[in-house]
Swiss-Prot record:
Keyword vocabulary terms for this entry: Cytoplasm, DNA-binding, Transcription, Transcription regulation
Cellular component GO terms held in the UniProt record: cytosol
Keyword hit for Magnesium: no
InterPro entries recorded: Integrase-like_N, TACO1_YebC-like_2nd/3rd_dom, TACO1_YebC_N, Transcrip_reg_TACO1-like, Transcrip_reg_TACO1-like_dom3, YebC-like
Compartment(s): Cytoplasm
GO terms, molecular function: DNA binding
Domain of life per record: Bacteria
The keyword Cytoplasm is annotated on this UniProt entry: yes
GO biological process, one term: regulation of DNA-templated transcription
Classification via SUPFAM superfamilies: YebC-like (SSF75625)
Name of the protein: Probable transcriptional regulatory protein Dtur_1615
Family recorded in the similarity comment: Belongs to the TACO1 family.
Amino acid sequence: MSGHSKWANIKHRKAAADAKKGKLFSQLSKEIIIAAKHGGGNPETNPRLRAAIERAREANMPKENIEKAIMRGTGEIPGVAYEEVTYEGYGPGGVAIMVEVVTDNKNRTAAEIRRIFTKHGGNLGEAGCVAWIFEEKGSIIIEKESVKDEDQLISDALEAGAEDVQISDDTVEVITSPESFSEVRDILKEKGYKITQAEVTKVPKNLVPVDGPDAEKVLKLMEELEDHDDVQKTYANFDIPDEILQSLS
């Protein structure tokens, strides 16, 4: 789980920059549109929409933007016809990578994602080539300053139904099953922990050690994928030493 936590922390630090560029709101809006399109506009009966709205609120997305995104998803107001696509491939050092996108032009996006992989020494593969390496888990990122007692947090999280707790220098990640994710998140929030990010994500079952030049190439590949306008989420199974990770990120 450590490799996942490292990448989760890097992405968490990038969130402020993404917000400044406006990409964060665009990502959140697309997720709400897709969730409403497939499950309806009522968050009480659509767990995916409820989670997307929670993320949007945590990012201080205006209420009007959220409501418009829901209506675009349900077709109440006109909007771009988006669809979800997942791309899979390998990066330098044999790192498995999954990329989830929301696009209005699959052909354009596929060509651009392939170019990014190739540019950084990776290759885009067929559907299913790396999906088996990952499993769905709930990920709850907590601001470490809001944690007064780490042992108490671990106890609270496990009692709420969490599977694991990963503690790093500046954040804490609580791992749950997809089924218990919402309940654990709500309980921890009620107990006063400051949750900065919460989502159902994909966690690698095994990690690939990456060092030296390959580590730099992998991070540049991941960062360019993250910066692409159509990309919603990225997942990878690299394990890069902390000292290299800090110097490159």
